[in-house]
Design a protein with these regions (language model features):
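Electropositive polyanion-binding surfaces
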Residues: 1-162
Length: 162
């Protein structure tokens, strides 16, 4: 069980957060939702998830990889503690990875929208994460990476009115 709060930062309309990040003062933690920890291989839930491969988001809603009723058990931050596959990463002063370990964990996750995270960028909790992110961007640019900013599009369908 991890002591520090982790943050699932996503669109305000997201209902199934599947990743979160934290910094404990030494390590960057990246958490991925871990339904495989409780879904039995070849069970109906497993077979259905493998057949779908991913959650499909369409204007009318979402065709979920895992059933809607399972969502609270597998998404991050919908319960007090969430099961996760967690990557503990030690970074050097430039943000390059020095060491990485993987653990099955229980994590406390606070959900934030992108807008909320931006407002809290200078807060004690999020400032280290933003610093790590900016170092990573700079390191990638120095290595020749090209950054393309694309607008995010969200389409919703309203019921037809007569």
């Amino acid at each position: 069980e991890l002591d520090c709060i982790s943050y699932a930062i996503d669109n305000a309309w997201s209902t199934d957060p599947d990743d979160a990040v934290a910094f404990d003062g030494k390590y960057l933690w990246i958490h991925i939702a871990d339904p495989a920890s409780t879904v039995q291989p070849d069970s109906p839930i497993d077979k259905n998830a493998r057949a779908r491969g991913a959650t499909l988001y369409i204007p009318e809603g979402a065709a979920r990889m895992l059933c809607e009723s399972c969502l609270e058990d597998y998404a991050l931050g919908l319960k007090e503690k969430s099961r996760a596959l967690s990557f503990r990463i030690l970074l050097d002063e430039n943000g390059a990875i020095e060491d990485c370990s993987v653990f099955k964990t229980l994590v406390k996750v606070k959900r934030l929208s992108y807008e909320q995270a931006d407002e809290l960028m200078e807060s004690e909790e999020l400032k280290p994460l933003f610093s790590i992110a900016w170092k990573n961007v700079e390191r990638r640019k120095k290595s020749g990476a090209v950054q393309i900013s694309m607008p995010e599009v969200h389409i919703s369908v309203e019921p037809e009115t007569k």
